[in-house]
Design a protein with these regions (language model features):
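Active-site-proximal, Lys/Arg-enriched surface segment
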Residues: 1-52
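Short, basic/hydrophobic alpha-helical segments
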Residues: 5, 9-14, 76-94
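Short, conserved catalytic/metal-binding motifs centered on acidic residues
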Residues: 22-30, 57, 93-103, 118
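Active-site-proximal loop/turn and secondary-structure-junction residues that shape catalytic pockets
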Residues: 28-32, 66, 102, 124-126
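Short acidic, glycine/serine/threonine-rich loops at helix termini
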Residues: 34-39, 60-64, 98, 105-111, ...
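Electropositive, glycine- and tryptophan-enriched low-complexity nucleic-acid-binding patches
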Residues: 41-89
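Short, surface-exposed basic-aromatic patches at helix termini and helix-loop junctions that form
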Residues: 87-88, 108-117
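An anionic, glycine-rich sequence signature occurring as long contiguous blocks
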Residues: 117-171
Length: 171
C-alpha cells in the first residue's frame, strides 16, 4: 500500500529508525474539494476527511473515509492498521495524542494495546462540572502561545477503568 511505501521511504532516508520510540499524533484533516465523489462534511463543505498519523513533522499514515460520516466511524480499524504497520517496521509508540474524536471506549482500547501512554482531548462534560469547579491548585502553562490553567482528576468512564482527565481552561 501507499502507507507501506511511505514508511519504507522514511526508513531508507534515515528519517525513522527501527527500534526507536516515537510520539504519534492523530487527527482528521478536512480537505475541501469540488471532485465528483466528495461528500458533505459537518464543517458544511464538500470534501474528504482522511485520518492522518504524524511523527514530528512526518506523515506516517493517511487513510481516507467518507466525508459525511462521524470521525469515529471505523477509526479503530484505521488506527489498528497504522499501529500494526508501525510494529511490523520495529517502531514503538511512546505517546499517542489525539483530539476528542478519538474519545470512545473501543478506540481507547485499541490505542492502549499499542502505546506506552496516550492523551486524548475529551469533550465538555456536564456530569463532571461540579467536580471540576471544586478543583484547587490549578497550574498555569503556555500552550502554542496561549496561556491556560491546567488540573487533573481521575475518572472512571468505561467498565471501572480509571483514567486521568487533564482539564484545561482559559482565563
Amino acid at each position: 500500500t501507499l502507507n507501506t511505501l511511505l514508511l519504507n521511504c522514511m526508513f531508507a532516508s534515515g528519517q525513522l529508525k527501527e527500534g526507536e520510540m516515537y510520539d504519534v499524533d492523530f487527527d482528521h484533516q478536512f480537505i475541501e474539494t469540488e471532485k465528483y465523489d466528495a461528500k458533505p462534511t459537518y464543517k458544511k463543505f464538500l470534501g474528504y476527511r482522511p485520518g492522518v498519523a504524524v511523527i514530528d513533522d512526518l506523515i506516517v499514515g493517511i487513510e481516507n473515509s467518507d466525508g459525511n460520516t462521524n470521525v469515529r466511524f471505523h477509526q479503530k480499524d484505521t488506527l489498528k492498521r497504522f499501529f500494526e504497520r508501525f510494529e511490523q517496521n520495529g517502531l514503538t509508540i511512546n505517546r499517542f495524542r489525539a483530539d476528542c474524536g478519538s474519545c470512545s471506549e473501543e478506540i481507547v482500547e485499541e490505542i492502549e494495546k499499542h502505546s506506552k501512554s496516550f492523551y486524548i482531548r475529551a469533550n465538555r462534560c456536564s456530569s463532571l462540572y461540579n467536580d471540576i469547579f471544586a478543583l484547587r491548585g490549578w497550574k498555569t502553562e503556555e500552550i502554542n502561545g496561549i496561556e491556560f490553567e491546567l488540573n487533573s482528576i481521575l475518572v472512571e468512564k468505561w467498565k471501572g477503568k480509571a483514567y486521568r482527565l487533564v482539564i484545561q481552561r482559559q482565563k
